[in-house]
Structure formats: C-alpha cells, structure tokens
C-alpha cells in the first residue's frame, strides 16, 4: 500500500536555515510558533514581534486552517507577515485537515533534520483551535517532546440551564451558581484541553485559568499567569485603526449608536438558534435600536444549510443593516473606539476580551463562556443565549435601554484585566526556558514484519 504524500505549500529556505543555525549556535530550543485561525493571526502578532526583537530562534509556521484573506490579513496588517517561514496549506473538512496536518508535520520534521538541527524544536501552540490540539499531539507522538501552550486553561462556565427561563434581569446571572460545561464550545472546549495535555509550559491569561489547570492536576511549576495577547493586539492596532476606511465604506455607521452583531460558533449555527437571534434582532430594530449584523462564512453557510437565507431579507425589511465581514481587524477596533458602538452581541471569545480591554459593553450569544472572568470579575460582559426570539428581544431591549453602569458596572475595571506587554513577557520567559528531555524510547524504531 503506498505511503500517503503531502507537500508543504511554501517554505522560506533561507529563514529556515538561519533559524536552525541560530538554535545550534546558541544551544537553545528552536521555537515553532504555530498560526492556525483568525484569532491566532491577531493575538500572536505581539509575541512574534517580541521574539524577533529579543532574537529568539524561531520559525513562524502557518497551518492554513484559515486561509480566506479576510481571515488571515492581520499578518500583514499588524506588521509581521515578512517573518513567515513555513506554510502547510491544509484544506478540507475537520478530519481531512487533521490528517494533512500530521503529514505536514512529518515533512517539516524531515526538513529540520535535513537542515542539521541539533537542538530541541518546541512548538508554541495557541488557544483552542484544532491545530493547537493536534499539532501538540502529533509532535509529542513523533518526538516524545512537549509543547508550550499559550492561552491555556480556558474552560467554559455558565449558569444551570434551567435558570434562564426564570431570569427577569439579565445581570442577575452573576448571582447564580455557575457550573462547568466540558464540551462547550464544540470542538474548541476539547481542543484546548488536548493542547495542554502534552504541554510542558502552560501560559494562562488570568488567575481563573490557573485555578482550572491546578484542579485538573497540572503541577504549579508548569503554570504561568501571563495575561492575554488580546490586550497587546488591541494596543498594537489602535494607531493603525485611526486610518481605517470603515466609515467611508459604510457611512451609515457614522450616524448614531449601533449594536454590532456577529455569530460563527457551531452551536449557534442551528436553525433554532439562527431564528431566535435574527428574529429577535428584527424586533429590536422595529423598536428603534440601530443594529448592524456582520455576516461570517459560518453564518452564510448555516443559512443555506437550513434553507433560511430568506431570514436576512426579513430582518433587513425590519431595519437591521446587514454587511459582509469587515475587511480588517483595525476596522473592528476603529468602530469599537469610535463612539458609534452601543454594544456588542457576539459569540467570539476574542471579542469578549477586546471589548473588556476597550471598556465596550458586551453580550455573549452563548449558554456558557470560556471567558467567565469577563462576566463575573470584570463585569464587562453578560451571557444572552439564543433561547427564543422573544427571549433575545426582551433582554436586549431591557439591557440596552438601562444605564450602562447597571448592567456592566466594571467597564473601567476590566481594561486592566488582561495585562499589558504580554508578548514581551512571554518572549522573556522563552529566553530562559529549558525544554525537558524527550521521553526515553520515543525514538525507538521497529522493523516491519517481512512475510516468510
């Protein structure tokens, strides 16, 4: 049976050779900084730039899990695309991409060996993507070597499911008993756990994340609370955001105050959830609230899948402004800081963090959140799950017509929740990090049985 084959999409041979030479010369690990999805392109910017500034030996590896230019342009926008060394170019379904990822890692490993690498190669995986989970797993299987997991310890919490129907005031959720939801969101809730299982150094954004990892049995010396790279990304984007053409592209957004809505999580791509949110938004627009719905690839696909494409026309007729995905990350930051953003209604983890850093009211369209600190500690966020159109409409109307401080009393406090200069701090940690020895027996080779 022939061996499966896969070719890397692109390799900067000179950058690869230079990084190997530096790691060998300095007798330091060669860090493989792994990009995967839109949040990675945004959040990892400051870390990549910091690693370059302190002259760490590293290779920037793009798996290709996201490849649409609208999703990946932050590499160029935030000033580090020139540092990209390897592109895997994986494509297809979740399982198909995972299979290709294994083959691509094998190809990269072969190139590192052919280039003469004598030091450990240590993956830096980020967040809760399938790439983060499986890159770390596959590297461990190949070498018996552990990874560094950035944004470790994210776990989803929320109120008991039965509590929502009796909730009169959305802010009362902070007084309810919250519990863990292990498989939410799908598949990210499991992916982030898998990424840490084969990690050696686990870098957690906030104290709650450290506590989650300790409860799961990870030893304290493996853990560091470092803040969130979202904080850096916002500050990196702010000077560029002033030049955003967003209001030239969409001049109506420069008038009034808008609820910005976006959805992409799989659990919100059901017919029931889509109808609840979109019909609820339509009713809100009839009430006179300005609503802009930013379409995502996931939303467009789900509307077609469930034969609900007509819902967009319905909500347009009721006054909801529907727009394609905004071209740049800096467009989002420009809008959030413009004075025209009333609040966010999103299922994005990154936007929950960015809204907290910027002091923008946030509502999360989920039954649980892997950023519970934004609701319970910073109090800059509230969960508003898509239970029904009436539920979404009633609570959006109520919370958006109240004084901001009643629903979001911690908007100013939240600005410091995720720290500052996080990428620089991580780069300084990596300068002195000693990678553990590979496991004994990990490189054992077995001869195939030859039929007699």
Enumerate the predicted regions with their spans.
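Catalytic binding pocket for nucleotide-activated donors in carbohydrate/polymer assembly enzymes
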Residues: 351, 357-404
């Amino acid at each position: 049976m022939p061996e499966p084959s896969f070719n890397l999409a692109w390799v900067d041979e000179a950058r690869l050779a230079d990084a190997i030479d530096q790691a060998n010369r300095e007798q330091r690990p060669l860090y493989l900084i792994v990009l995967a999805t839109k949040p990675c392109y945004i959040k990892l910017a400051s870390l990549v730039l910091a690693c370059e500034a302190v002259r760490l030996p590293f290779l920037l590896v793009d798996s290709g899990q996201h490849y649409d230019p609208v999703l990946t342009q932050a590499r160029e926008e935030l000033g580090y695309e020139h540092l990209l060394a390897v592109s895997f170019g994986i494509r297809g379904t979740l399982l198909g991409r995972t299979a290709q990822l294994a083959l691509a890692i094998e190809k990269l490993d072969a190139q590192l060996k052919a280039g003469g690498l004598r030091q450990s190669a240590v993956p830096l995986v980020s967040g809760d993507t399938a790439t983060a989970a499986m890159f770390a797993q596959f590297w461990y299987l190949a070498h018996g070597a552990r990874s560094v997991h950035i944004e470790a310890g994210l776990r989803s919490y929320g109120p008991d499911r039965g509590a929502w129907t009796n909730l009169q005031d959305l802010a009362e959720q902070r007084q309810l008993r919250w519990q863990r939801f292990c498989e939410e969101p799908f598949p990210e809730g499991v992916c982030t756990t898998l990424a840490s299982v084969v990690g050696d150094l686990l870098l957690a954004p906030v104290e709650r994340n450290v506590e989650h990892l300790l409860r799961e049995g990870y030893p304290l010396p493996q853990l560091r609370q470092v803040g969130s790279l979202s904080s850096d990304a916002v500050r990196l984007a702010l000077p560029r955001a002033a030049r955003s053409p967003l209001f030239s592209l969409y001049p109506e957004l420069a008038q009034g105050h808008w609820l910005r809505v976006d959805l992409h999580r799989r659990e919100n791509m059901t017919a029931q959830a889509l109808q609840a949110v979109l019909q609820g938004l339509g009713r809100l627009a009839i009430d006179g609230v300005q609503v802009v719905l930013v379409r995502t690839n996931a939303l467009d696909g789900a509307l077609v899948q469930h034969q609900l494409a007509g819902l967009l026309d319905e909500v347009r007729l009721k006054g909801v402004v529907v727009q394609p995905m905004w071209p740049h990350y800096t467009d989002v930051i420009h809008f959030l800081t413009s004075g025209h953003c009333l609040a966010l209604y999103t299922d994005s983890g990154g936007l929950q963090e960015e809204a907290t850093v910027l002091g923008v009211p946030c509502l999360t369209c989920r039954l649980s959140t892997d950023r519970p600190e934004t609701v319970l500690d910073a109090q800059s966020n509230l969960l508003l799950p898509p239970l029904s159109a009436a539920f979404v409409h009633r609570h959006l109307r109520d919370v958006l017509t109240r004084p901001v401080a009643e629903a979001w009393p911690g908007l100013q406090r939240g600005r410091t929740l995720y720290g500052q200069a996080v990428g620089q701090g991580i780069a300084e940690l990596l300068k002195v990090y000693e990678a553990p020895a590979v496991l004994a027996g990990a490189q054992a080779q077995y001869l195939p049985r030859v039929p007699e």
